[in-house]
UniProtKB/Swiss-Prot annotation:
Residues 22-71 are extracellular. It is found in: Cell membrane. The chain crosses the membrane at residues 4-21. Essential cell division protein. May link together the upstream cell division proteins, which are predominantly cytoplasmic, with the downstream cell division proteins, which are predominantly extracellular. This is Cell division protein FtsB.
Amino acid sequence: MKILKIFLLSLLFWLQYSLWFGKNGVLDFIKIYRRVTIEKKNNEYLDMRNNQIILEIENFNNHINKDKKKT
């Protein structure tokens, strides 16, 4: 019975170590989650900038069309 307890405790510690520090463990998940959050914020900024550029292009095209109509 004592050997079984030692084996089960060893297994538990090994599984916990793998969960927290192993490949694709909790620490890797936290790192990736932070990167994704940063990239989402960056994408929001780029979307806003793209929308501003689209508005500038539309305004430019409207001014060109007005000038063509005047002539």
